[in-house]
């Protein structure tokens, strides 16, 4: 839903494919060869009308999962931090695809850590990234916050909004007003950084403090 706000997108899961192609188990149709021409034709037709196709793999390393992996130009790992990384088999397959791909055609691998809430500071992120290396980027989202999904959608569609705050000692307090002006005009901030006093403001914003909290 959030992705469709920025670019026409289509979500495709194994269940949806089986419903559309009237098959009981697409894994059987794909078989060990990993090809099923009605599926290829179906996805080709979809791609004519949508900018992005989101493919949902299975947790196991199945023919459907392999088909998705071979077709994808970006891997998005959704991780529940309370469970950690459990699908090592799929990761191994993706690593093999990367090894067999010319460097200039390598697929981006990005980690999305899905929190029930973000009241607590994230932990073990570096461990997750090390297990999935090479990772081009990682994001923390609150699955109950639509704004976080909108931020992720902007990032995926290359429409993210970044702000860099400059230094200036006490004058850096003016950044609070600049931040409030952005919010008042409905301009979200997806990426934030700064130098000197600006870095302090960037850290406060990245921590999710409201304007009222900042002022107090």
Where does each model-flagged region fall?
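Walker A/P-loop phosphate-binding motif and the immediately C-terminal alpha-helix
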Residues: 1-25, 46, 152, 197-198
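Short internal beta-strands
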Residues: 12, 110-114, 191-193
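Flexible beta-alpha connector loops of hexameric P-loop NTPases
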Residues: 25-35, 83
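Conserved catalytic-core segment of NTP-binding enzymes
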Residues: 36, 42-43, 48-137
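Structural motif
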Residues: 52, 74, 160-162, 191
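A short, charged/proline- and glycine-enriched loop
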Residues: 107-108, 156-161
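C-terminal helix of von Willebrand factor
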Residues: 121, 134-158
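Patatin-like phospholipase
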Residues: 162-164, 169-216
């Amino acid at each position: 839903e959030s992705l469709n706000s920025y670019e026409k997108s289509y979500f495709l899961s194994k269940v949806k494919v089986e419903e559309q192609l009237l098959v009981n188990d697409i894994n059987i149709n794909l078989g060990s060869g990993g090809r099923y021409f009605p599926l290829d034709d179906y996805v080709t037709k979809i791609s004519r009308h949508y900018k992005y196709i989101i493919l949902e793999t299975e947790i196991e390393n199945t023919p459907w999962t392999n088909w998705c992996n071979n077709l994808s130009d970006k891997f998005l790992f959704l991780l529940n931090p309370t469970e950690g990384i459990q699908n090592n088999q799929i990761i191994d397959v993706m690593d093999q695809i990367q090894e067999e791909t010319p460097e200039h055609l390598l697929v981006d691998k990005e980690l999305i850590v899905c929190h029930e809430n973000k009241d607590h500071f994230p932990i073990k992120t570096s461990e997750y990234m090390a297990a999935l290396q090479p990772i081009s980027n990682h994001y923390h989202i609150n699955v109950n916050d639509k704004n976080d999904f909108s931020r992720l959608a902007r990032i995926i569609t290359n429409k993210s909004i970044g702000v860099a705050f400059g230094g200036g000692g006490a004058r850096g307090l003016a950044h609070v007003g600049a931040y409030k002006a952005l919010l008042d005009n409905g301009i979200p901030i997806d990426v934030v950084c700064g130098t000197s006093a600006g870095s302090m403001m960037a850290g406060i914003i990245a921590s999710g403090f409201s304007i009222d909290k900042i002022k107090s």
